[in-house]
Swiss-Prot record:
Its EC number is 2.1.2.3, 3.5.4.10. The lineage of its organism: Bacteria, Pseudomonadati, Pseudomonadota, Betaproteobacteria, Neisseriales. This is Bifunctional purine biosynthesis protein PurH. It catalyses: (6R)-10-formyltetrahydrofolate + 5-amino-1-(5-phospho-beta-D-ribosyl)imidazole-4-carboxamide = 5-formamido-1-(5-phospho-D-ribosyl)imidazole-4-carboxamide + (6S)-5,6,7,8-tetrahydrofolate; IMP + H2O = 5-formamido-1-(5-phospho-D-ribosyl)imidazole-4-carboxamide. The keyword Hydrolase applies. The IMP cyclohydrolase activity resides in the N-terminal region. GO terms for molecular function: IMP cyclohydrolase activity; phosphoribosylaminoimidazolecarboxamide formyltransferase activity. Keywords: Hydrolase, Multifunctional enzyme, Purine biosynthesis, Transferase. InterPro entries: AICAR_Tfase_dup_dom_sf (IPR024051), Cytidine_deaminase-like (IPR016193), MGS-like_dom (IPR011607), MGS-like_dom_sf (IPR036914), PurH-like (IPR002695). One of its GO terms (biological process) is 'de novo' IMP biosynthetic process. Pfam families: AICARFT_IMPCHas, MGS. Pathway: Purine metabolism; IMP biosynthesis via de novo pathway; 5-formamido-1-(5-phospho-D-ribosyl)imidazole-4-carboxamide from 5-amino-1-(5-phospho-D-ribosyl)imidazole-4-carboxamide (10-formyl THF route): step 1/1; Purine metabolism; IMP biosynthesis via de novo pathway; IMP from 5-formamido-1-(5-phospho-D-ribosyl)imidazole-4-carboxamide: step 1/1.
Length: 526
């Protein structure tokens, strides 16, 4: 145990700092501080010694040099268990500093502001703070380093239970947290500066490249998993330090077994798909592919339509809703075997009802607009990085390329099918009618094979394709896919266009009296 007798507090984010400092003072801890933090403590009657008074050296260079002094860093880095360290510190009048409480200039918040000039960014790169954090973290055997306001209450509680001392285990945990903190901070600075053109001046907002020269990823482990995609693979789940709003990482598990690797991968696919719809929607996913999607007046109706698309594939799947789920919906869903149930919220009656299915994993995820900044795909020895596919085509962007003109209902169905196709593994073909998928063909090496599978799925489900529509995630390389679609009685097609055989494909649609629209963008998904 290390008794805390002297602390240095210098924080940018002052959340909770008064209460923490008062708690330290109540334990008889001498408090050193700088600038605005020292003023805040003094103004609120917390005993404090200015660092400049303690070191005998004034702050200078507009506050750039405050704590970079041997009396500060010697007091932090000195080892109490080495006689030569103790002797040298005594010789130079350097006292021990037992606790350092520091958080850093808000660099990321600064560069996130619209119009942030390079000069403003540079001025918000903390120097003294990280130096103290790293010094204290290195000497964790004798010094406690505090970088997170959330830790203040627990530390005061531990000191209260141990006559003002903190355990070795606590100090080590704080050290690990501190090094993670400075790594994330330096990573953000590196990402920013390596994306800025070297010849730009300090004034004005700099032009930044989308992809920095060096990409620093900061993630934190949520859990170790029993295994990965297969039982012989090891796995863990990590989330971003600051996950994008509305993403799966914000989930709250209400019940059920621990999420598996495949549960999380499939849940992400289901959630990303369902949250893209404005109307009440249900998405059922199996092996990261939608096997049923529908929009309707309410979640229960949407579920019934989505489930009807492919009752066989839905077995053991993931079911996601974009609206609060009630008891009636849970009762319907509970009639099938499922792995995970996801929604923004569940009524109390729904929670009570699903509790009987103890193995079902139930997740609440807030519906918010947001997407990951980057999508990452590992390849041998490297990483593919791209922006996410968040493009949703609008009615005004559609180009009718056939003699037949789509009706208003067909246009609505085409936009629905197109939105679904974005989440189906390529080659993707989606048949739909009335806000319901009627057949989904996924993941085939040839587009015509995906078309045939979608047709067979509709037939197996007993769903009529007469006057339904079809969506293709990429262009038709030949007319054969259109011919197969026509055989099903489908009346309209949506696809990107852009094939060297577009004219041949359009001619096939005209021969069959099918309306066809081009979107101008594709949705490959691998």
């Amino acid at each position: 145990m290390t008794k805390i007798e002297r602390a240095l507090i210098s924080v940018s984010d002052k959340t909770g700092i008064l209460e923490f400092a008062r708690g330290l003072a109540a334990h008889g801890v001498e408090i050193l501080s700088t600038g605005g933090t020292a003023k805040l403590l003094a103004d609120n009657n917390v005993p404090v010694i200015e660092v400049a008074d303690y070191t005998g050296f004034p702050e200078m260079l507009d506050g750039r040099v405050k704590t970079l002094h041997p009396k500060i860093h010697g007091g932090i880095l000195g080892r109490r268990d080495l006689p030569e360290h103790v002797a040298k510190m005594a010789e130079h009048g350097i006292g021990n500093i037992d606790l350092v409480c520091v958080n850093l200039y808000p660099f990321e918040a600064t560069i996130a502001k619209e119009g942030c000039a390079l000069e403003d960014a540079i001025e918000n790169i903390d120097i003294g703070g990280p130096t103290m954090v790293r010094s204290a973290a290195k000497n964790w055997a004798h010094v406690a380093i505090v970088t997170d306001a959330a830790d203040y209450p627990a530390l005061l509680e531990e000191m209260g239970a141990n006559a003002g001392a903190l355990s070795r285990a606590t100090r080590f945990d704080l050290s690990r947290k501190a090094f993670t903190h400075t790594a994330a901070y330096d990573g953000a600075i590196s990402n920013y500066l390596t994306a800025v053109q070297a010849d730009q001046g300090l004034a004005g907002e700099p032009v930044r490249t989308l992809f920095p020269t060096r990409l620093n990823l900061q993630v934190v482990k949520v859990q170790d998993m029993r295994y990965g995609e297969n039982p012989h693979q090891s796995a863990a789940f990590y989330r971003d330090l600051d996950p994008a709003p509305g993403t799966l990482a914000h989930y709250r598990q209400l019940q059920g077994k621990e999420l598996s690797y495949n549960n999380i991968a499939d849940s992400d696919a289901a959630w990303e798909a369902v949250k893209t719809f404005d109307d009440p929607a249900c998405v059922i996913v199996k092996h990261a592919n939608p096997c049923g999607v529908a929009v309707a007046a309410d979640p229960l109706s949407a579920y019934r339509l989505a489930f009807a698309t492919d009752t066989t594939s839905a077995f053991g799947g993931i079911i996601a809703f974009n609206r609060e789920v009630d008891a009636a919906t849970v009762e319907a869903v509970s009639a099938q075997f499922l792995e995970v149930l996801i929604a923004p919220a569940f009524t109390d009656d729904a929670k009570a009802l699903i509790a009987a299915k103890k193995n079902v994993r139930v997740l609440e995820v807030p519906v918010e607009a947001g997407a990951n900044r980057f999508e990452l795909k590992r390849v041998g020895g490297g990483l593919l990085v791209q922006t996410p596919d968040i493009k949703n085509v609008t009615l005004d962007e559609l180009k009718v390329v056939t003699k037949a003109q789509p009706t208003r209902q067909q246009l609505a169905d085409l936009l629905f099918a197109w939105r679904v196709a974005k989440f189906v593994k390529s080659n993707a073909i989606v048949f739909a009618a009335g806000g319901q998928t009627a057949g989904i063909g996924a993941g085939q090496m040839s587009r015509v094979d995906s078309t045939r599978i979608a047709a067979r799925k509709a037939q197996d489900a007993g769903l009529s394709l007469k006057n339904a529509v079809a969506a293709s995630d990429a262009f038709f390389p030949f007319r054969d896919g259109v011919d197969v679609i026509a055989e099903q009685g489908i009346s309209a097609i949506i696809q990107p266009g852009g094939s060297m055989r577009d004219e041949e494909v359009i001619k096939a649609a005209d021969e069959h009296g099918i309306a066809m629209v081009f979107t101008g963008n594709r949705h490959f998904r691998h």
